[in-house]
Amino acid sequence: MTPEPGDGSAARRAFAAAAGSRLFILLVGFVTAAAIGLGDPPWTLIFPRHAAPFDGVLGWLFDPWGHWDGVWLIKIAVAGYAESDGSTAFFPLYPLLLRYVGVLFGGNLLLTGLAISVACYGGAMVLLYRLVREQYDARTAALTVTLISFVPTSLFFQAVYTESLFLLLSLACFIWARKGSWKLAGLAALLATLTRSTGVLLIVPMAVCYYEQRDWSWRRTDQHVVNLLLVPLGLLMWMTYLSLAFGRPLLFAAAQEEWRRSFAAPTVAVGRALAAAVLGAAQLLSGQNLTLYWPVPKPSSAFGMAEHNLVSLAFFLLAAGLLYYGYRRLPPSDWSYFL
């Protein structure tokens, strides 16, 4: 990467957009919570003492970011895993960070999670900017950071979710792999696998980077290839814990059934998504409550699910189109990471 005039201003614009997006989303959450409330989740049943949400104005500001997965991650950080409640579907690194970093925040794990997610998001944006800038100009790098900061789903980057941590670790893995720092890349991939099950897929871009740097020659394989095994090691560590604690090394996979999820080939998953989207369109056009995979709790929620399925299909098709576009223009290592 050769410095060019305007690099500094482009970087400042990128990070101003990243910071501004966090403040904007925080403000939207605050206004929404103040206007319509937060609902009535069983906070007192799940959040332990000193980890409870805030009250009043502070509650409107911070509590929206601890819902859904956040509640489970906080519960695990305090009470640990159980065999039959589906908690083992959540991998352990984020709850461990909550538990031990929480000491710095007086044990308030909601605030701890917000701090962890925002810090990881900031680090990820720095890495993303540098990654893009190595191959393109500063304007493209700044635009990339701006787009990912303002995409609607970027709200999860500051919630008590694993998205920011996983993005940071996966980017670090890929950047180090591109530079040939295989031990660091393997360590980052191991930690990513301890964050989310999809981390194990980082072995693909790592392997592509490895052999791309060796002109695709198997004969040039050296001792550094061993570091690729650090990727599945994270999964093996998690399975070992589950085996010792519950006698079920694959409990994390069985727990997916609690969330109505299962493993399937990509073609099967896409086929199911298309069927759900078609049924969703039929529901919205006909006004009828139709059931495909499981009944919804109340008729009105069927139409919300239909809208969700259609939006998900639209984003899937957009992503597929971008992947095809990238396949024709990006190096194999870059494309494999984006895949």
Which functions belong to the PLM regions below?
Residues 127-130, 147-150, 165-184, 203-206:
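Specific aromatic-rich, kink-prone transmembrane helix
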Residues 100-103, 112-135, 318-323:
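Transmembrane-helix motifs of polytopic, lipid-linked glycan transferases
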Residues 64-107:
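Short hydrophobic/aromatic helix or loop-helix immediately within or flanking a transmembrane segment
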